[in-house]
Structure formats: C-alpha cells, structure tokens
Amino acid sequence: MSERTQEQDFVIITVDDSDDNNDCSIEMVEVSETADNSTNDIADDSTYVTADNPTDDTATQPNFPGGNDGHHRPLQMSYGSGSVTQAGVQWHDHSSLQPQPLGLKQFFHLSLPSSWDDRRTPPCPVAHGDQIVSQINHPVHLRRYSYNSEEVDFPKRGRFYTPEVQSSISPPAERQETHAWASPAVTSLESAACHELQEADLSESLSYPRIVSSSSLQQYVAQGGSFPCFGMPWNFISGGAESTNAVISFANATTAVPMAVLSRRESSLANNPGVVNYSALPENENVGPGRALSSFCFHPNLEMPERPANSSKNSTETANYPTLMGNYNGQNTASLSVFIPPYFAEKIILTEMPGTTETNVENNSQTVYYPALSGNTSAPYPASSYLPITSNFESGPQMSYGTMSYSTEMKNNCDQDDASASACLTPDFALLPLNILVKVDTNTENSVNTMNRSTLLDSDSGQDSSSSSVCIPPKYGYLGDPKRNVRVLKIHLLAVQNMAKPKQAACYLVRILFSKEILISSSVDIHLKDSQSLDPNKMAALREYLATTFPTCDLHEHGKDWQDCISGINSMIYCLCSEGKSTPKTVRKNKKRTNRVASASADRNDQRGRDGGEGCSWMFQPMNNSKMREKRNLQPNSNAIPEGMREPSTDNPEEPGEAWSYFGRPWRNIRMPCSVLTLAKTKSCASLSARYLIQKLFTKDVLVQSNVYGNLKHGLCALDPNKISALREFLQENYPICDLSENGRDWKSCVTSINSGIRSLRHDVRRAEARSQSLPAVTPPELEQESKPGDPDATDPST
C-alpha cells in the first residue's frame, strides 16, 4: 500500500464468526484520488467482494436472515458522489459532500455477519478501478476505529425512517474481552460466547451488514424533511431485521429529548432498545393492523444504573403515550413519530390529560401509559403515541422515587381499584394545585415499575379521592353584640359598609329594623326628638354596629356623631308621618265615596294590592279605561287616575277581551296590555317611553311615595326592581342604538326622566290637597240629585 501525503480513505471489511478454528480476514481498501474518477465505472461493473466465492468476479448474494421472497433486501441508498456495491451491500463515500480537513483519514467500516465467511477466507482481490489491493489478515475482533466513526444499520426497503441516537463508541479492548458488540454507545448484533448458544439463536444473531462512514458525522440538516418544523440529519440510515429504528448524528442530538438508554450489559439493539417512541399528532389517521412503529431514538444525556441483561424481546424501557387527537381505528396500530420538545410534552401531561389510564407492562419493563387525549378511539388496543415525561428522567432497578398518586376524578366512578393511580414526577414539573393522595403501588410479579396517571374530570364518587366542600355563608348576620339577638340580612350589612357616613347607615338600618307603622306610631305618641320609644335593645345594637363599622366616628351614647344619627332618624320619621297624614284628610271629608283612598305606603311588600279607588276625591273625575285609550289622553300630570294605572294582575286581567303580552323577559312574569306596549314603541326616544310606562307599571299612590332607586334620607323607597329591570329590557329591545345597560348613559337619562315625572306627580297631589283644605266640603252634584230628605238610604255610604 503506497503512502500518500494527501488525504487517504480506507475501507475496513470485518467478517465475524464464533468459530475459533477460523481466522478473520479484514480487507483495508485505500480510496485514492483515482477512485473518484472511476466511480462510475465501479458502479457499472458492480464489482463485489464475497466471502463464499473470493475469486468470483460476479455478484453473489449471501443468505440473509429470512431470505425468502417476501423478505426485503437492504435498501440501496446513494447519498454521496461515489459508491461501491459489495455482496448486495452498498457503502458510500460522502467526502465529496462535506469538506474534510487535511490529514484526516476517512475509514469505511463494513461489518459482515458470521454466515458470510468461515474465518479462514483466502485472500481475494478487490477490484477498485484498475488497482488490485492486497489483503491484510487480522484477528477476528480487531478493528480500525476513527474518533468520529459510528455504526449504523440498513433499513428495509420502502420504509420511512426517523433518526436514532447512539452514544460514544467503546474501546476495542473491551470488545475483545466481552466478545460482544453491545454498549451504551454502539449497539450492534451480539456475538455469542459459545458455539452452542450461537447455533440455538442463529436466527436472532444474524442481521444485515453495518457500515460506518466518518463523514456521516457532519452537522447537516435536510431542508425537505417529512416534518418541516424539526431538524433531521441528511445521512440517517436505519437497519435491523425486526427494528425500524434510525440513527442521527451527535451534532443533532442536542435538540432531542434525553431519555434513558441501555446499560452496558444489555444485549442487542433489535431485542433490547432503550428508545422512546412518539406517535403522530394529526387527526383522522387510519392505520392498519400490524404496521410497524417508526420512532426516534434520542441521544441520552442522563444516566441509568446497570441492570442484568435479558435477551428477551420484551425487556424494554419505553415511555408509552397514546394519540393526542384525531380518530384512530384499527387494532394494535401505530402511527408515525413526531419530535416533540420537552416543554410541549410537559404542558400536555400536566394540564391536558383526560381519559382513563391503564398500565401496559410486559416482562421487566418500565412503562408509562397515557390514553388518548381527544378524539374517538374505537379499537380495543389503539395506536399509542409517545411523549417524553421530563428531560431529567432516571430509571433504576427499584424505582426509588416518591410516587405521587393523583386521585381519579371521573363521573360515576365507583370502582375502588381505579380510584387512584400513581405518577412519577420529578422536581422539574410545575404541578397544578390539586387534591392528591399519596399511594405507592408495587407489583413484584414481573419486577415492573409502573407509572400511571389518573384523569381529572368533573365529578368523583371514588372512595380514595378527597372532595372539597363548598362553604355557603349564613343568610343572616348579627347586628352588634350577638347576645342581643338582633339579626338582619347580610346583604343589608354589606350595603351599610359601603356608605360614607354613619347618619345614612343609621336611617337605612332603622328602616330595616322597624316597620312603617311602628315608626309612625312612635313619633305620634311622644316628641320627635325622643327616639326612646323605639326598641332600646335594637337601638343599642344599631349603635354598637355603627361604632364597629365607623371606628373613627364618635358613636358613644352621647357622642356627636350618634346625635347626628338620631336627628336623621327623627327627620325620616317626620317625613313618613307627614306623607301618611296627607291622603286621609281628603278621605275624611268625603265619607260618601264608594272607594276611599288607601293610605300611602312606601313599603315594597305593600305595593301589590294597593290601589286607589275610582274617584278617590271629588276632584278626580272617574273615566272609563276604554275612553282614555280612544282619546289617548294619558298625560303623566293628568288629574284623572284611570284603572289602567293599576298594577296589571296576571290572574285577573282588567279586561278579558284585551290582548296581553309579557313585559320584559317572560320569567319575570310581568304582563302588559298590547295596546300600551304598542303606544310605548311609538315614542321618539327611550326616556319618553320610560316615563309613559312607569305610570302603567305602578299606581299613583305608590309613585308619590317612591323613587326609582329610593332615598331613605327623604323617606322614599325604591320601586320594585323586578319591574324596573323589565322596563330596561323592554327599552333595550326597542331602542337598540341606545346604551341602556345598568350604568349606561341613556338609561341614566331614563331614570332622570322617571324621577322628574314622579316629582311632578307629587307636586300636583300636594297642590290639590292645599286647594281642598281652603274650600269647604262640597257634595258632588250626582249625589245631591240622588239623595232625598225622606230616603233612608241617602246617608248609606254603600249607595
């Protein structure tokens, strides 16, 4: 072999066998510059180097495992510029694609199975253009290594493969001692220690040749990968008779999810891979039964303690997660894999994990199984998609983590066995605030360490889960010292706390504690400045509560602020007395009227059933309701009080022949005549319509004593909020361009217009009362004509 000053390339061909009587022949082929020129000639001649027929120039195919007609032959791939095909195996020279530094030798490592040679292969010439390269015999396991070499497997034909990471290469000395090619870095076919084991497991030990290219370790990412958002190496090669795993370079391994890998004493890549599979995310993915999994095998940066190797096919460490979304049909189906970053997987695992959980464990495996997150999964054992748990995952022989069991929260879940499930979490997780139960589940039958996560749904009837009770505050609260046993609704106490002055709060609470009749009677019997006529226990409780609510005010028994509160209470009582005495004066002077005017009441509970009679005074001329509708004489300041002003009754309508409809939302149970609603819709603006409808909703006696929102300082109560809300909804429906929300500008204008109309009505009533006091009592002309001196029924008020 001639020495060269330039860059030299070598090809190492190794024949492996467990027979001690045979020797190994390793052919080192020097790739010179003339090899590049003769690449096309070599490809056309298809020169092969065989172990069975060393002197034959024709192509001979070895007996591959499962070499029947249905078995796929190794895939012929052409990534480089030059290629040499040997015994059905094609190796490639990628040196033309990537720049190589000077002085760096490139080695091409071709590893052949034991069935290709009998250890004592006679020297065979290797045709490389016009050169004949001599053969060099080496020991069976002696290999030439490069610092950046790597072993790969051939894929099956027609498969799509995703990359898999292998770690660093173990030294040759260790391979000579152990007689095995399995290590955490390079996983190849295991050579049996004895001849009997090899004969027994001949079908398992055979595999395709493996090829190593030093230039395959260059950093490169393809532009047209199957997954555009994830980097894929340009020179990934997959292999193995039963495996569909691929290899990626260490340069791209930093973007992958680190997971646990095989220990040094575990056997082969095909039978014992420490891989993590990730299935596809898209929707409506239908895959047939028996389809192989395509998975990523990422470069591990985490350690896993050693464990005795088992050659069974089920000895895997797999993180198993089912499909995320979509409709997947078919039994035992699998989908393509997608690289998912750790932060994406953690977010899905922590916050979006509905569904039921099961544990899929077979013969010494560490399995994490998560069911489908969404979509319809109709198969009994649907395809599983695989997501990483965490970037700092470690696996030991006995699972020494603290296992956290999330209680299963499902609808109508009475199964005690499914009430809780354990999940192994590392400190990197950001846990949501959940009620958890600590429970360790151990299964020593197959030495299985299971990690299972429960679902979080609405209701939970399981016995192992903890339920949170809703604390409903009590309806009533004590006023002052609880020993006084003075209770009011808490809503009133909250309203008092929002008031600015204790005087307003005192008037509000007095109106709540005492009825109107008690306040009026107390103020009539004694002097108005003396409030001791009221219940002293309630008044003391009122003062104590005000002192607690307004600590900066002087609310002692003789304090300044408390005296102001008493003055405000007396002013309110005086207003109530004056308003109550105003209407009965006219009634006493007109005892012959059929219906007397009821006493004014601002109490909200007394509004229903309170209406003025027809012609409550001689000034109010009775008018038929039908005549008023014909004349449309429904002005707010009219002296006549028609029957239409009475509150509508849903049980007994005023006119059975009149069409009625709901006012506002139907659940408010407020009905109004359709003619009234039609007239209200014809108003030019919302404020005029509200001013018209307020007289149809309430009687005149209620309006003169009330206000829209009330004013306790002046003795005015708020109108029925249910009817006010119905009015606002009606206006909002018929005037959509107006801002008629609770705090809307147009609704405030409507409230101002309603209050203005009520003030006008109140002023007219007072002016009528003043005129009636100045004039003598006059009997109406109708009664004078009917009454005669000798008629005994003349003085009967019933006539």
Swiss-Prot record:
Residues 603-613 have a biased composition (Basic and acidic residues). Its main location: nucleus. One of its GO terms (molecular function) is DNA binding. Residues 483-582, 667-765 form the BEN domain. Residues 32-73, 584-616, 629-656, 768-799 are annotated as: Disordered. Keywords: Nucleus, Repeat. It comes from the Eukaryota. It is found in: Nucleus. GO terms for cellular component: nucleus. InterPro entries: BEN_domain. Residues 586-595 have a biased composition (Basic residues). Pfam families: BEN (PF10523). Residues 34-63 have a biased composition (Polar residues). This is BEN domain-containing protein 2. It comes from Homo sapiens.
